[in-house]
């Protein structure tokens, strides 16, 4: 009986060690996973309607190998036919709705091969807004980006602050 207990204890110890090591590797600063911490902040004046009232907006996060097709395509090609418009650069995409005054934090593990995340925002007035933005991610590292969506479009918070200082 004690021999059986010893085998069970050894197996449990080995299993615990494997689980513990797997957990440590997932939070390791030496991880090879490409990560993006993305904060999207919607202003209180987001996406005004015809009467100037703020409105929710649909936002798509699009993982890309290269940004050129995303940067050159028109809004409707990207919104309605992303797979065809961005092939072969499209890796993955995700969609969400952002309400005026809302802040959303994402902690994304970017797919292997993705080097950029395109942000596509479905503004009511496409001609007068910056409806796309590209975030370059560093392979096998953590990239942090904070974007603001307001009545004029999508902007990097740090770039907007730098322009205000000029």
Question: What does each of the following model-derived ranges do?
Answer:
Residues 20-23:
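C-terminal motif of bacterial Sec signal peptides marking the signal peptidase cleavage site
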Residues 25-28:
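Bacterial signal peptide processing site
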């Amino acid at each position: 009986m004690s021999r059986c207990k010893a085998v069970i204890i050894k197996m449990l110890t080995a299993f615990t060690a494997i689980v513990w090591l797997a957990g440590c590797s997932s939070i390791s600063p030496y991880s090879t996973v490409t990560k993006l911490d993305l904060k999207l902040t919607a202003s209180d004046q987001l996406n005004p309607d015809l009467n100037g009232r703020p409105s929710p907006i649909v936002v798509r996060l699009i993982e890309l190998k290269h940004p050129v097709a995303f940067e050159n395509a028109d809004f409707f090609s990207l919104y309605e036919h992303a797979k065809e418009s961005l092939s072969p650069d499209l890796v993955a995409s995700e969609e969400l709705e952002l309400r005026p005054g809302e802040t959303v934090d994402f902690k994304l593990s970017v797919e292997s091969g993705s080097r950029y995340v395109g942000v596509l925002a479905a503004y009511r007035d496409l001609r007068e807004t910056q409806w796309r933005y590209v975030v370059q991610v560093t392979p096998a590292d953590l990239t942090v980006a904070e974007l603001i969506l307001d009545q004029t479009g999508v902007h990097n918070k740090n770039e907007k602050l730098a322009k205000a200082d000029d």
